[in-house]
Amino acid sequence: MTDTERANPEGRDAYLVVDDDVAFAKVMKRLLSVHGEPTVTHCVEDALAAKPPDGRWTAAFLDFDLPDGNAFSVHEGLLARGERVPTVIITGHIREDVANRAFELGMKLLVKPIGPKHIRIFLETIRGEVAVRQVVEDWRVRYGLTAAETAVLRAGLEGVDRGTLAESRGISETTLRTHVRHMLQKLGDASVSDAIQRALREVISSKGGE
């Protein structure tokens, strides 16, 4: 079952919590309620079925071992739908294989018990990532970017080079250059550098001018 409190979701960050330990899930819900709107689930299936109040998760907090899979199952399920969600695994013990795989996937790792300080530090570290993601989504809608063009924009903002992007998408660099050209035509920018600089100004503005 999904335990969701959405009395006033507008304007609040949305957090996905997945933990089959009901008591600890309640603790996480209380800790996260200070910062935004937590949705608590207890298995992979319910986690992937849960819908964030505003259409996208700000972050996910995942127990590693779950009744129908594990934290990687949730993370990869979200990615398969095109949802890039900053994620932290919260576990009672560290396993080398889990830590290494989490690192490869860009996931953070925390060991129980955790408190408000750990939550605050994690949310501060992903603030920039969340701002970038929001600007990319805004531009996708505003300029009618395709999935490939959106990937080019996101890669530029994240500092991913074109060779790596082409390899990760399984396309040639010639095809990638075509996506870049079409993206620039839609954006009205003379170069990728100009587009990235303009997008970064929006990212900074969304973070309060830092």
Question: Model segments located where?
Answer:
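Hydrophobic "lid"/C-terminal helical patch
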Residues: 123-126, 156, 199
